[in-house]
Curated annotation (Swiss-Prot):
One of its GO terms (molecular function) is protein homodimerization activity. Residues 1-50 are annotated as: Disordered. It comes from Paraburkholderia xenovorans (strain LB400). GO terms for cellular component: cytosol. Keywords: Chaperone, Cytoplasm, Stress response. Its main location: cytoplasm. This is Protein GrpE.
């Protein structure tokens, strides 16, 4: 007769093996989670670093845009200031010329037959004009007796003279400078070499 009873050990594994198998099955998700956590840990650290870098980039971009806008504002204000300076630079000078205009208009309105009075009026007006020019730092050049300077003088002719050669003998037309910059060179005659 055959033994119809099966070996209980073949159907039912030993309780220790079963427990080990169950423990292994239960531990598998935990190990997988731990492995994922181990792999997630560098990934999450990388994501955190990436997020931090992106935040820093956004902050720097905003800072750059603000600085660029401020630079544009400064440049625009500087251009406006220069434009205003050019527009109104002559204002002070023009204010000094207004009395000269008043004097000339008065002379035209009250013309006199007396040449002495007319001359006196013209001389006063010339002094007013010279004063206005000097207030604007415009000064006349009268270089008689000075060495010829091609930067400040324009020689019209050379004449024999008792003076040292290349010395200004006569001024045909005054020159003018404004703050050491030549507006118009003086037209002069120069002593010729002997």
């Amino acid at each position: 007769m055959e033994n119809t009873q099966e070996n209980p050990t073949s159907q039912n594994p030993k309780p220790a093996e079963e427990t080990a198998r169950q423990a292994a099955e239960a531990a598998a998700p935990q190990q997988e989670a731990a492995a994922n956590a181990a792999t997630d840990s560098p990934a999450s650290a990388e994501q955190a670093a990436l997020a931090e870098a992106q935040a820093k980039i956004a902050e720097l971009q905003e800072s750059f845009l603000r600085a660029k806008a401020e630079t544009e504002n400064v440049r625009r204000r500087a251009q406006e200031d220069v434009a205003k300076a050019h527009k109104f630079a002559i204002e002070s000078f023009a204010e000094h010329l207004l009395p000269v205009i008043d004097s000339l208009e008065a002379a035209v309105a009250h013309s006199s037959d007396d040449p002495a009075k007319v001359r006196e009026g013209v001389e006063l007006t010339l002094r007013q004009l010279t004063g206005a020019l000097e207030k604007g730092r415009v000064v006349a050049l009268n270089p008689v007796g000075e060495k010829f300077d091609p930067h400040r003088h324009q020689a019209i002719s050379m004449v024999p003279a008792d003076q040292e050669p290349n010395t200004v003998v006569a001024v045909l037309q005054k020159g003018f400078v404004i703050a050491d910059r030549v507006l118009r060179p003086a037209l002069v005659t120069v002593a010729a070499p002997k």
